Each structure stands twice: as structure tokens, then as C-alpha cells.
């Protein structure tokens, strides 16, 4: 076999012509300590705060503490395979999650990776999880109602699109049920819902997803989950991942509802990370910036101005209290950040008042501007009536010789409490709520026995649907009460057919 010099020289020339003298510079460090979801690395001198870094086994981390000699990294995945001396390299990217329509109907983790077994999420768009909240001039005051479908909330503590309303209460008082019912009521309301489960049992998250699927609510809902078995960094990041996914829709002129269930567990995870990163502890061993942890999250909820597209992001953060103590550190922090709170009380819950909303301690700082005109008219005095009933009720236990006015107040109050009770996963459209509350406030229920109130409500609404559909239709379309006398005549006609059980 003869070797041709021309062929060899031609090949060498071709290789020289195609030679690319690119030098890839990658910033590489060395792990000097690892454990409990935290790694310390030496040598990453140019790393950015919040930057993603990659360990030699492919697990990602996020740079948190930038110190003189080393970098504190929170590990976003299993850390047992990472060893002292392993390489860790910069990616040049800030922590980001996938966003877009393709996420709707999916269950994802804090990193936006699907965990529902339905294959990958087909989206190429991402957003950084830490983003600036809309400025003062980019916002508009909250004026559109967000109907939860829960009478006690829509009448007493109305929520508007773009508001932040805290739901606070002990464990097992129905906080998650309020969230699920609110999501179910957003059907056909052109609203994207995001349910963020932080530190929940996986069985609980499964039940929530199945409930949403059964009622057809998964068609407009994204579920972000960081279960109790996952490392603290993922629990800490879950709410930010949820709000980032929501912001993508908000900035495109859509309306979004984000539910954080619950932020107490996020604060605990952040405390754990901060102590492991050797940051100085403060009150209740929380780090000094635990207020900023929640404020920068909740400030990203907004009603955008028309110039910015008029989209909105409504936040419903949950806080779990211990023995009803709303004056603890985290509850007071979040109360001061939000635009009101709904307080769920275990005493009410166990006495059969469900949803167990304490009307005296619950407040909405947006108030009437987040209600339709009809609801404002029928629910105007409801709150005061309920408060005075609770006061009179405690006095009435001591004596029976009450004057007629007091007795009338007690009777009306008992019926009000009964009307505001509501079954699980049975949200009511606002026009039906108005119809029922009109009957209550105008005294049409005063002669109906308390034990029959729920039956009266169900039968009356069914009767209205069949015989006076135009009354409900006018409330739905105009937002105001129907013409004078229409409700009265309907109620009088229905009451003739209603048979009390006594």
C-alpha cells in the first residue's frame, strides 16, 4: 500500500482550515463540606447570588452564601452522592423555572419538573424565580371581585382580583377546603389557578389533585408540590416557583389565583437552611430576613394597570397557628403584609359552623370595591348583625327575660349563622348568594325554623332556577339587584309551597 504525500498534505491543510481556536473558560470549584442539603465549595470566586451550580454527579445547587473563602450552596436534589473534593461548576444562569400554557393541568415540583407521570412539559420558555414586583405606577387599585363561591367570604370579607388575603387558623380547621372550593368556583371565569403545596403529605396532595380532576378544575389549574419528604431547599423554593408561573400569565393580561398552602412550613424550611448556612438566628431562631422572605413573595401579587395589560395575580397565603395564637412571629408578619385575613376558628369548626370563619377577627382591607352592587346592598349590615349576635348570645345564656328587640336580634343571628354554613365542594354562584342573603336580610326567614334553613335555601334556589330564571340572570348580567318587588313576589310565592318540618 503506497502512501501519497499529496493526500496527506491535503488532509492536514483541511484540518488547519477547519481548526477553531475557541477557549472555553468554566469556573470550577471544589466541595469542601457537604451534609443536610448544604454544600460549601472553594474556588467559585465569580459566582452570582442565586446562581445555579452543577455538581459532578449532575445534581444542581443554588449559591446562597457568598463568603470570603467559600460559597454556601443549597442542594436542589439528593445530596448523599456528593462527596468532599467533588467538582462543582458554574452554569452562569440564575435559578429559573419553565412557564407557559403547557403547564396547565400538570403537577410539577419546585423546579418545574413534572411529577405526575404524564411525560415531559413541552415548553421552552423560562423565567427567573426571583423577580421585581410591579412598581407603583404599573398597578391599579383592586376593583374586580374574585368570587370564591363561599357565602361567608363573598358577603363578609370579599376578595378582589389582585388582592392578597391571608387564610389563617389552626390545623384541621378547613383551610385547604376553602382553597379547593375557591378553585372550583373559578370554572368559566377565565382564571388560571396555581395551587402550591408546601410540606404536605403526598397522600394529601394526591387527594387534592383527584378532587380537582373529578370536578374538571384541573383544566385551568397548575399544582406545584414540595412534599414533606423532600429536602428543605425545595420547600423554600416552591412558593417562588408558583408565583413565577403565575406572573407569566399576569403579564400577558390574564387573571391568576395563587394559593400557598402553607407559608408556615416554608418559613420553617428557610429557618433550617439559614441555621445550616450559619446565618445568625433571631426571634424564635428565624433569620433576620424572614419578613423579607414573605414580603418579596406576596408583593408580586398585583392588579396591573391597563397600560401593562390589566392582568392580575391574587394571592391566598395560608398560615397555620398554634392553639389560635395569631400574635406569634410569622402570623403577625404575614398579617402586616397582606390586605386582610380570614380567621378560621377550631371552636366554630367543631360546633358545626363550617366554613369556620370568625367574622369578628376576619377583615378585608379592599372591602366593598371587590363586591358587585347587589352583594354590597344585601350584605351591608350582615357583618355588624353577626357581631352583635355573638355579643348578645353570650349574655342571653344568663337570663331568659329578654325584650322583644333583643329576642328578634337573636333569632335573626341564629338564622344568619345557619345561612352562612356551606357544604364541602359546593361553591355557590354570586347571583344565588344574593338571592339567599336578600331573603335573610329582608326578614323572609324570620318565621322559618332554624332546623329548616338549609332545606329552605336548597329548595328556594332550585325553585328560582325553574320558575324565576330571569331574576338570577339579571343579577349575573347587570351586577345590580333586580327591579323592586321581583324578589319579594318570588319569595312570597315560594313560601306558600314550602312546608316547615315542625
From Swiss-Prot:
<comment type="similarity">
    <text>Belongs to the ATPase alpha/beta chains family.</text>
</comment>
<comment type="subunit">
    <text>F-type ATPases have 2 components, CF(1) - the catalytic core - and CF(0) - the membrane proton channel. CF(1) has five subunits: alpha(3), beta(3), gamma(1), delta(1), epsilon(1). CF(0) has three main subunits: a(1), b(2) and c(9-12). The alpha and beta chains form an alternating ring which encloses part of the gamma chain. CF(1) is attached to CF(0) by a central stalk formed by the gamma and epsilon chains, while a peripheral stalk is formed by the delta and b chains.</text>
</comment>
<keyword id="KW-0813">Transport</keyword>
<dbReference type="InterPro" id="IPR000793">
    <property type="entry name" value="ATP_synth_asu_C"/>
</dbReference>
<keyword id="KW-1278">Translocase</keyword>
<dbReference type="InterPro" id="IPR033732">
    <property type="entry name" value="ATP_synth_F1_a_nt-bd_dom"/>
</dbReference>
<dbReference type="InterPro" id="IPR020003">
    <property type="entry name" value="ATPase_a/bsu_AS"/>
</dbReference>
<dbReference type="InterPro" id="IPR036121">
    <property type="entry name" value="ATPase_F1/V1/A1_a/bsu_N_sf"/>
</dbReference>
<dbReference type="GO" id="GO:0043531">
    <property type="term" value="F:ADP binding"/>
</dbReference>
<dbReference type="InterPro" id="IPR000194">
    <property type="entry name" value="ATPase_F1/V1/A1_a/bsu_nucl-bd"/>
</dbReference>
<keyword id="KW-0547">Nucleotide-binding</keyword>
<keyword id="KW-0139">CF(1)</keyword>
<dbReference type="GO" id="GO:0045259">
    <property type="term" value="C:proton-transporting ATP synthase complex"/>
</dbReference>
<dbReference type="Pfam" id="PF00306">
    <property type="entry name" value="ATP-synt_ab_C"/>
</dbReference>
<dbReference type="InterPro" id="IPR005294">
    <property type="entry name" value="ATP_synth_F1_asu"/>
</dbReference>
<keyword id="KW-0375">Hydrogen ion transport</keyword>
<keyword id="KW-1003">Cell membrane</keyword>
<protein>
    <recommendedName>
        <fullName>ATP synthase subunit alpha</fullName>
        <ecNumber>7.1.2.2</ecNumber>
    </recommendedName>
</protein>
<dbReference type="InterPro" id="IPR004100">
    <property type="entry name" value="ATPase_F1/V1/A1_a/bsu_N"/>
</dbReference>
<keyword id="KW-0406">Ion transport</keyword>
<feature type="binding site">
    <location>
        <begin position="169"/>
        <end position="176"/>
    </location>
    <ligand>
        <name>ATP</name>
    </ligand>
</feature>
<dbReference type="InterPro" id="IPR027417">
    <property type="entry name" value="P-loop_NTPase"/>
</dbReference>
<comment type="function">
    <text>Produces ATP from ADP in the presence of a proton gradient across the membrane. The alpha chain is a regulatory subunit.</text>
</comment>
<dbReference type="InterPro" id="IPR023366">
    <property type="entry name" value="ATP_synth_asu-like_sf"/>
</dbReference>
<keyword id="KW-0067">ATP-binding</keyword>
<dbReference type="Pfam" id="PF02874">
    <property type="entry name" value="ATP-synt_ab_N"/>
</dbReference>
<dbReference type="GO" id="GO:0005524">
    <property type="term" value="F:ATP binding"/>
</dbReference>
<dbReference type="InterPro" id="IPR038376">
    <property type="entry name" value="ATP_synth_asu_C_sf"/>
</dbReference>
<keyword id="KW-0472">Membrane</keyword>
<dbReference type="Pfam" id="PF00006">
    <property type="entry name" value="ATP-synt_ab"/>
</dbReference>
<keyword id="KW-0066">ATP synthesis</keyword>
<dbReference type="GO" id="GO:0046933">
    <property type="term" value="F:proton-transporting ATP synthase activity, rotational mechanism"/>
</dbReference>
<dbReference type="GO" id="GO:0005886">
    <property type="term" value="C:plasma membrane"/>
</dbReference>
<feature type="site" description="Required for activity">
    <location>
        <position position="362"/>
    </location>
</feature>
Amino acid at each position: 500500500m503506497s502512501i501519497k504525500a499529496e493526500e496527506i498534505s491535503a488532509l492536514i491543510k483541511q484540518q488547519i482550515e477547519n481548526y477553531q481556536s475557541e477557549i472555553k473558560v468554566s469556573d470550577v470549584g471544589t466541595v469542601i463540606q457537604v451534609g443536610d442539603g448544604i454544600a460549601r465549595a472553594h474556588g467559585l470566586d465569580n459566582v452570582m447570588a442565586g446562581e445555579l451550580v452543577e455538581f459532578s454527579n449532575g445534581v444542581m445547587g443554588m449559591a446562597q452564601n457568598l463568603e470570603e473563602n467559600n460559597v454556601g450552596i443549597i442542594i436542589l436534589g439528593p445530596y448523599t452522592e456528593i462527596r468532599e473534593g467533588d467538582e462543582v461548576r458554574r452554569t452562569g444562569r440564575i435559578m429559573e423555572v419553565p412557564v407557559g400554557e403547557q403547564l396547565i393541568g400538570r403537577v410539577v415540583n419546585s423546579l418545574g419538573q413534572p411529577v405526575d407521570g404524564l411525560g415531559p412539559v413541552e415548553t421552552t420558555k423560562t423565567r427567573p424565580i426571583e423577580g421585581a414586583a410591579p412598581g407603583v405606577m404599573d398597578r391599579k387599585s383592586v376593583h374586580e371581585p374574585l368570587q370564591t363561591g363561599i357565602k361567608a367570604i363573598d358577603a363578609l370579607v370579599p376578595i378582589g382580583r389582585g388582592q392578597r388575603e391571608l387564610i389563617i387558623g389552626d390545623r384541621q380547621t378547613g383551610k385547604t377546603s376553602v382553597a379547593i372550593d375557591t378553585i372550583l368556583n373559578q370554572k368559566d371565569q377565565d382564571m388560571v389557578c396555581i395551587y402550591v403545596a408546601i410540606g404536605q403529605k403526598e397522600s394529601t396532595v394526591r387527594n387534592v389533585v383527584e378532587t380537582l380532576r373529578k370536578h374538571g378544575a384541573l383544566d385551568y389549574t397548575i399544582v406545584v408540590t414540595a412534599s414533606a419528604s423532600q429536602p428543605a431547599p425545595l420547600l423554600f423554593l416552591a412558593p417562588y416557583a408558583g408565583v413565577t408561573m403565575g406572573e407569566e400569565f399576569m403579564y400577558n393580561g390574564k387573571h391568576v389565583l395563587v394559593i400557598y398552602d402553607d407559608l408556615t412550613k416554608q418559613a420553617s424550611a428557610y429557618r433550617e437552611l439559614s441555621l445550616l448556612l450559619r446565618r445568625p438566628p433571631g426571634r424564635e431562631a428565624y433569620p433576620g430576613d424572614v419578613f423579607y422572605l414573605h414580603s418579596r413573595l406576596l408583593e408580586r401579587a398585583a392588579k396591573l394597570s391597563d397600560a401593562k395589560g390589566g392582568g392580575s395575580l391574587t394571592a391566598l397565603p395560608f398560615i397555620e397557628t398554634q392553639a389560635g395564637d395569631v400574635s406569634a412571629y410569622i402570623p403577625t408578619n404575614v398579617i402586616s403584609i397582606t390586605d386582610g385575613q380570614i380567621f378560621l376558628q377550631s371552636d366554630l369548626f367543631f360546633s358545626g359552623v363550617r366554613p369556620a370563619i370568625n367574622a369578628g377577627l376576619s377583615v378585608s382591607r379592599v372591602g366593598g370595591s371587590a363586591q358587585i352592587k347587589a352583594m354590597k346592598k344585601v350584605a351591608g349590615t350582615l357583618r355588624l348583625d353577626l357581631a352583635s349576635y355573638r355579643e348578645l348570645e353570650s349574655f342571653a345564656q344568663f337570663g331568659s327575660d329578654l325584650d322583644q328587640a333583643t329576642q328578634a336580634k337573636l333569632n335573626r343571628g341564629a338564622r344568619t349563622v345557619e345561612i352562612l354554613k356551606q357544604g364541602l365542594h359546593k361553591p355557590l354562584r354570586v347571583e344565588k348568594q344574593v338571592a339567599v342573603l336578600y331573603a335573610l336580610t329582608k326578614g323572609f326567614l324570620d318565621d322559618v325554623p332554624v332546623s329548616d334553613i338549609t332545606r329552605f335555601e336548597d329548595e328556594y334556589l332550585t325553585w328560582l332556577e325553574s320558575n324565576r330564571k330571569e331574576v338570577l340572570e339579571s343579577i349575573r348580567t347587570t351586577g345590580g339587584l333586580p327591579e323592586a318587588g321581583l324578589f319579594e313576589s318570588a319569595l312570597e310565592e315560594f313560601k306558600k309551597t314550602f312546608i316547615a318540618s315542625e
